[in-house]
């Protein structure tokens, strides 16, 4: 299944964004921020789920959301929001929520291990508070940046070991960190795959085919993967261009 995840859509009223996506993709990964904060659109989303054949999944809020924060008050608010998203997804029958694994802040730039420990505690708390929800929770690998955590396969796999969390492989992010082939070896641990392109130096979110990622190789390595492919794009039009490129490879994403 090919879905779209398009952050700019979260700045539009939900119904307007839905009309832009409906009938053009099999699924929509809603970015739950801006005008699409899940508590605010819960009723509209429930109606959309019941009246559309499209599959809906959720990308948890990411702006200002840091599960690696050392500030107890901020971290509590972040965890409360993420747990709320998972539980609303459970109530609506949405099967998957994707989250980011936090980032460094001024206090942890020189003590990275403190942020990593906070992330581990956060994952354990989310796991405990959402136990029994039945919602698939995925942690996404991050791109190259002076602020990012969990860019290496062994780090994020170790983070999710012993939990119900799976990995959301972000192909573009892995290209910037130079370890896409290593990530692809662990495809059985993937709950979903994010698709966009870049030239290996920055997280550009280009349409597929405009960067240097070998998507023929990626699709071949993922030929037995049964989860969703989510095209992350800067606009619906670029998302459609990415889909057309993938289909032109004469290889069908699951």
Residue ranges of predicted features:
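Active-site acidic/histidine proton-transfer and metal-coordination neighborhood
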Residues: 72-166
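Histidine-acidic metal/acid-base catalytic patches
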Residues: 1-3, 12-19, 95, 149-157, ...
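Soluble or luminal CAZymes and related metallo-dependent hydrolases
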Residues: 13, 37-41, 77-81, 115-122, ...
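Acidic (Asp/Glu)-rich catalytic clusters
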Residues: 17-23, 39-57, 86-93, 127-132, ...
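Active-site beta-loop-alpha junctions enriched in small/polar residues
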Residues: 7-9, 30-35, 61-63, 102-104, ...
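N-terminal pre-domain/capping segments
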Residues: 1-84, 90, 166, 252-254
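A short acidic, helix-capping loop that chelates divalent metal ions and anchors anionic groups
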Residues: 64-70, 105-110, 200-206
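Generic enzyme active-site microenvironment
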Residues: 27, 57, 138-139, 168, ...
């Amino acid at each position: 299944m090919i879905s779209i995840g398009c952050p700019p859509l979260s700045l539009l009223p939900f119904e307007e964004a839905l009309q832009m996506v409906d009938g053009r993709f099999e699924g929509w990964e809603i970015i739950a921020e801006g005008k699409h904060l899940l508590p605010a659109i819960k009723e509209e989303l429930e109606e959309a789920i019941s009246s559309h054949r499209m599959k809906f999944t959720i990308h948890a809020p990411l702006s200002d959301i840091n599960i690696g924060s050392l500030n107890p008050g901020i971290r509590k608010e972040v965890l409360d929001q993420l747990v709320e998203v998972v539980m609303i997804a459970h109530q609506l029958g949405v099967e998957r929520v994707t989250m980011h694994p936090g980032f460094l802040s001024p206090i942890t730039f020189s003590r990275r291990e403190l942020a990593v420990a906070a992330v581990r505690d956060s994952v354990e708390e989310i796991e405990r508070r959402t136990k029994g929800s039945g919602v698939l929770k995925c942690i996404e690998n991050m791109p190259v940046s002076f602020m990012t955590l969990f860019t290496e396969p062994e780090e994020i796999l170790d983070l999710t070991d012993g939990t119900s969390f799976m990995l959301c492989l972000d192909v573009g992010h892995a290209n910037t960190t130079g370890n896409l082939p290593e990530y692809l070896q662990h495809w059985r641990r993937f709950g979903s795959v994010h698709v966009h392109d870049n030239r290996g130096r920055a997280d550009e979110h280009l349409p597929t085919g405009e960067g240097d990622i070998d998507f023929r190789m990626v699709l071949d390595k993922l030929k037995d993967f049964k989860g969703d492919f989510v095209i992350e794009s800067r606009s619906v039009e670029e998302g459609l261009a990415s889909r057309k490129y993938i289909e032109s490879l004469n290889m069908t994403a699951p």
